[in-house]
């Protein structure tokens, strides 16, 4: 969905809302693509948080190097 949305992306901040409105109104199934993208991203981060919770449960934070790499990856995902 990100590739389909990127085709209609506008980097100008004054046209950002117009870009979203164009995608939803003028692109065939644009509203569906936008909703799938938003819900898919939310599900992705829920899975990430569950994975972190599993690490807490099994004590993976005791392995400092692995845990620090995981923290760096999480921060990279959020950036």
From Swiss-Prot:
Its cofactor is heme b. It holds the Pfam family Cytochrome_B. It is a multi-pass membrane protein. One of its GO terms (biological process) is mitochondrial electron transport, ubiquinol to cytochrome c. GO terms for molecular function: metal ion binding; ubiquinol-cytochrome-c reductase activity. Heme b b562 binds at residue 37. The chain crosses the membrane at residues 1-7, 31-52, 67-79. It is found in: Mitochondrion inner membrane. Keywords: Electron transport, Heme, Iron, Membrane, Metal-binding, Mitochondrion, Mitochondrion inner membrane, Respiratory chain, Transmembrane, Transmembrane helix, Transport, Ubiquinone. Heme 1 (or BL or b562) is low-potential and absorbs at about 562 nm, and heme 2 (or BH or b566) is high-potential and absorbs at about 566 nm. Belongs to the cytochrome b family. Component of the ubiquinol-cytochrome c reductase complex (complex III or cytochrome b-c1 complex) that is part of the mitochondrial respiratory chain. The b-c1 complex mediates electron transfer from ubiquinol to cytochrome c. Contributes to the generation of a proton gradient across the mitochondrial membrane that is then used for ATP synthesis. This is Cytochrome b. It comes from Corcorax melanoramphos. The lineage of its organism: Eukaryota, Metazoa, Chordata, Craniata, Vertebrata. The gene is MT-CYB.
């Amino acid at each position: 969905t990100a590739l389909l949305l990127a085709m209609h992306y506008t980097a100008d901040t004054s046209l950002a809302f117009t870009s979203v409105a164009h995608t939803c109104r003028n692109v065939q199934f644009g509203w569906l693509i936008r909703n799938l993208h938003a819900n898919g991203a939310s599900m992705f981060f829920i899975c990430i948080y569950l994975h972190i919770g599993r690490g807490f449960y099994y004590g993976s934070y005791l392995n400092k190097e692995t845990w620090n790499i995981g923290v760096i990856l999480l921060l990279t995902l959020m950036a």
